[in-house]
Design a protein with these regions (language model features):
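Lipolytic serine-hydrolase domain surface
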Residues: 1-33, 91-97, 101-142, 147, ...
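Glycine-rich, highly charged phosphate/nucleotide-binding loops
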Residues: 32-40
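Short, surface-exposed "cap/lid" segments of acyl-processing enzymes
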Residues: 39-107
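The conserved beta1-alpha1 loop
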Residues: 54-58, 167-168, 210
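Extracytoplasmic/periplasmic, Sec-exported soluble proteins
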Residues: 58-65, 122-126, 166
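Generic recognition of short, well-ordered alpha-helical segments
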Residues: 65-68, 176, 220
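Gly/Ala-rich beta-loop-alpha elbow adjacent to hydrolase catalytic centers
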Residues: 130, 166, 170, 174
């Protein structure tokens, strides 16, 4: 399937995390009572889609670059399925439909700039509206997708699976949204983890690329993820060539970040594996854990300047990991 602009929808968030909509007079906030109506008008999952992806970008990403990044990741995944479709036997076909979450993440490439965007990402979710808005979006997508296997899976009746993909600070926005849903009273994830009953939505997998958060974030900050509406694993990549979550994160938070050293402590055991080449299959046993830390130090190596390889995540190996998660979700 060839990619087109129609395969991607864009959600723009204001600095306070509220949803904006494009009008003849420019961007303006969507009234709270119109959130679900706006989702229905702009973000209804098409019946042809097999998988719904929600992508949140990271630090130093312009709106145009965010869209380019999503197209790049989808193109890599498409090329991989065409090159080796037998690698993903349950992805027949693979027809993704993507929602890109954009937010103001630009700053000076300095310690002060890093702290500024770190604080903004945190404030947008904890003091602002980002977690609520993204959580409502995920709930809408879940309610309107077709359920591939019946009640406890986050796939619609026609079999649509929901995957979250974040990069850098965008991972924080997604984690806060899922955590927000875990605290809500009333929906739910082919993994061994039981489907969480009574949740506002369920996610089939969460891929966090070079997450900008402390190594103990899942134990101390995103503590509700252990009981959140996740049917599949939380998978986080890391590379010791990532200076943003290594050098800058260490100076900003006095400790290395997940994107540099992997997941540390978490509410459940953490499985650590290496990132595989597109020609090597990921066994179900390698990914079927609540938390999986993926060492990409041999893959994410390109980059110069203050961030190092922080944004070297758009690689065939990343697409292979995403496709493997989608395949094992069936």
């Amino acid at each position: 399937m060839s990619l087109s602009r129609a395969d991607i929808r864009v959600v723009d968030l204001a600095p306070d995390g509220w949803l904006m909509e494009d009008t003849p007079s420019g961007l303006r906030p969507v009234p709270a009572h119109r959130l679900d109506a706006h989702f229905a008008e702009e973000l209804a999952p098409p019946p042809w889609a097999t998988d719904l992806l929600v992508y949140a970008h990271g630090w130093q990403t312009s709106p145009e670059s965010a869209l380019t990044s999503v197209h790049r990741l989808l193109a890599l995944a498409e090329a991989q399925t065409q090159h080796d479709s037998a690698r993903y036997p349950r992805l027949k076909p693979w027809r993704p439909w993507t929602v890109l979450v954009r937010w103001p993440s630009r700053s000076l490439p300095s310690l002060g700039g890093y702290r500024r965007i770190r604080d903004r990402a945190h404030a947008m979710s904890t003091q602002g509206h980002a977690a609520h808005v993204i959580g409502r979006l995920l709930g809408y997508l879940d309610a309107h997708r077709t359920d591939p296997a019946a009640p406890p899976v986050l796939a619609n009746r026609d079999g649509q699976y929901l995957h979250l993909v974040g990069h850098s600070f965008g991972c924080r926005l997604l984690c806060e949204a899922v955590q927000w849903s875990a605290r809500e009273e009333p929906l739910t994830l082919g993994w061994s983890t039981p489907s969480p009953a009574g949740r506002p939505f369920t996610v089939d997998s969460m891929l966090l690329l070079q997450m900008a958060a402390p190594r103990d974030a899942f134990a101390n900050t995103f503590t509700a993820l252990a009981g959140a509406p996740l049917r599949g694993p939380v998978v986080a990549t890391y590379s010791q060539h990532d200076r943003a979550t290594g050098f800058w994160h260490l100076r900003a938070e006095k400790r290395a970040g997940i994107g540099y050293a992997g997941i540390g402590t978490a509410p459940a055991p953490v499985s650590t594996i290496r990132m595989l080449s597109p020609d090597e299959p990921y066994p179900l046993a390698a990914l079927d854990h609540r938390f999986v830390s993926v060492d990409a130090s041999d893959v994410f190596v390109r980059g110069h300047g203050p961030a190092g390889a922080h944004s070297d995540h758009l690689r065939p190996e990343s697409a292979h990991l995403l496709l493997s998660l989608a395949d094992h979700s069936r």
